Amino acid sequence: MATFTTEQAGYQMQAILQVIGYDLLIVVTGGTNPHIGDVTTLTASTVPETVKFPSHDGRFHKDNFISERMAKRIQRYLAGSCTITAGIHVNQITKAQIAAAAPMTDDLSRQIISWLQAHPVQAEKPEYYGQDEQPR
């Protein structure tokens, strides 16, 4: 597991990366009220898909801006699947803090890419039955 942080405009964002076999789980949180606002899934060769969760005030979270931006940046470095959750909330957020989310996400993405390049994913390849084989 690896942890990456970035700070700008008076708040911090953090990404925790967990390698699971060939797959990655990335949890991005930050601000005054971290949460899970959305989930984005992808592989190196598939279009990212996102599910947004309802927020406490009945609207949907907008954290997909972060997870989808990160997904686009790290996609070509993936060996397997990747699941990104994002949940950043800053109480009484300012326009400057909203604008900072993009470069902060880019910074976290660069840190993750550097880590992946320095620590290539290594896992045993799974074995599968052939088309004419069945479990005994």
From Swiss-Prot:
InterPro entries per UniProt: LpdD-like_chaperone-like (IPR048844)
Knockout mutant characteristics: Cells lacking this gene are able to decarboxylate gallic acid and protocatechuic acid.
Note from the entry: Gallate decarboxylase does not form a complex composed of Lpdc, LpdB and LpdD. The term subunit has been used in reference to the three-gene operon. Gallate decarboxylase LpdC is the only protein required to yield the gallate decarboxylase activity.
Role summary: Probably involved in tannin degradation, however the precise biochemical function in metabolism of gallate is unknown.
Family membership noted in the UniProt record: Belongs to the CinA family.
Protein name: Protein LpdD
Highest classification ranks of the organism: Bacteria, Bacillati, Bacillota, Bacilli, Lactobacillales
